[in-house]
Amino acid sequence: MKVTVLSVGRLRPPWTDDVAHYEKLLGRHCRLEIVELRDGARLGARIPERAFVSVLDEGGTAYDSVGFSRFIEQRRMSGIDLCFVVGGAYGGVEVEADHRLSLGPMTLPHQLARVVLLEQLYRAHSILAGEPYHHG
């Protein structure tokens, strides 16, 4: 399964180390591509063809970690790649989406949202693989 994370804005320290950490861990479970774009105007053009598109949105569907792992497993079983879209500092992502994902009711800085998304992707894959990372 290929997972693409499209993000508006450039990642800056200290978040770069965290993203690199989860990028390395996720490499054992999926093919991960992280794409940073200067502005949201180009997002639509960078979405992979036939990918299931999930936009981060505070009004989207919220999952617990096990529920999110089930969401990932359903996508994996369908044979369709996943594309997550993370807006910039001012949000406002305007792309056609199959799904809207909430990381919780609080507003997060876009750089932190990217780290949280990658951590939850790793946690979901660890749950599916039966690895001891998740203690829930």
Predicted regions mapped to residue ranges:
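N-terminal beta1-alpha1 ligand-phosphate binding loop
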Residues: 1-26
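Conserved RecA-like P-loop NTPase ATPase core
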Residues: 5, 54, 87, 117
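Hydrophobic/aromatic beta-strand patches that form the interior of the parallel beta-sheet core
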Residues: 6, 35, 54, 99-101
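Short glycine-rich anion-binding loops that position phosphate/pyrophosphate groups of nucleotides
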Residues: 11, 58-61, 88-91
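Short glycine-/acidic-enriched loop or helix-start segments at secondary-structure transitions
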Residues: 15-17, 64-66, 93-96, 112
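Glycine-rich, phosphate-binding/catalytic loops in enzymes
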Residues: 22, 70-73, 99-100
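S-adenosyl-L-methionine/SAH cofactor-binding core of RNA-modifying enzymes
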Residues: 27-83
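Structured adenosyl-cofactor binding patch, chiefly the S-adenosyl-L-methionine
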Residues: 90, 94-135
